[in-house]
Amino acid sequence: MISTNDFRTGLTIELDGEVYQVIEFQHVKPGKGSPFVRSKLRNLMTGAVIEKTFNAGEKVPKAHVDRREVQYLYNDGDNFYCMDMETYDQFPLTKEQFGDAINYVKENTNLWVLFFKDKVIGVELPNFVELKVIDTPPGIKGDTASGGSKPATLETGYVVQVPFFVEVGDVLQIDTRTGQYIKRV
């Protein structure tokens, strides 16, 4: 059990049999009444975000989430196969379990799979990945001054907005949290 006074961003707690991660929290001490903690929580199984208010000092059960490093190997259309980096066991993940990670991983990419009570609840990516541009319209000379952008298709099939100077074959750094172009590598 953990006190709501000890909430930190990223902490995982268990509510109603579900696992939630604390996204935001705020300790509030009103002039009248007892203090409370206002929090924003993400359900790690469904991805839904809820707002919940706790009394200050209230005890909630801490969720023990196991984070294992894996290497993405390949997919067969419906399943995404990964290998545990400690035991070298291979196991499949469904599209739903893999989530948005589909847009950012290529074969042999290392990532983390989150387990709760031996059940996969999510996939955690590195903050930045490097992907190659396979298709983008050519930039027109003089367009760079306007600071505009154009779409570029990456090797995973993901489409991202990039500056005009980016060309086919360039390797780009992409932020997996926002899905945005960071820089050309």
Curated annotation (Swiss-Prot):
Its main location: cytoplasm. PROSITE patterns: EFP. It is found in: Cytoplasm. GO terms for biological process: peptide biosynthetic process. Pathway: Protein biosynthesis; polypeptide chain elongation. SMART domains: EFP (SM01185), Elong-fact-P_C (SM00841). Keywords: Cytoplasm, Elongation factor, Protein biosynthesis. The keyword Cytoplasm applies. InterPro entries: Elong-fact-P_C, NA-bd_OB-fold, Rib_uL2_dom2, Transl_elong_fac_P/YeiP, Transl_elong_KOW-like, Transl_elong_P/YeiP_cen, Transl_elong_P/YeiP_CS, Transl_elongation_fac_P. It comes from the Bacteria. GO terms for molecular function: translation elongation factor activity. One of its GO terms (cellular component) is cytoplasm. Involved in peptide bond synthesis. Stimulates efficient translation and peptide-bond synthesis on native or reconstituted 70S ribosomes in vitro. Probably functions indirectly by altering the affinity of the ribosome for aminoacyl-tRNA, thus increasing their reactivity as acceptors for peptidyl transferase. HAMAP family: EF_P. Belongs to the elongation factor P family. This is Elongation factor P. It comes from Carboxydothermus hydrogenoformans (strain ATCC BAA-161 / DSM 6008 / Z-2901).
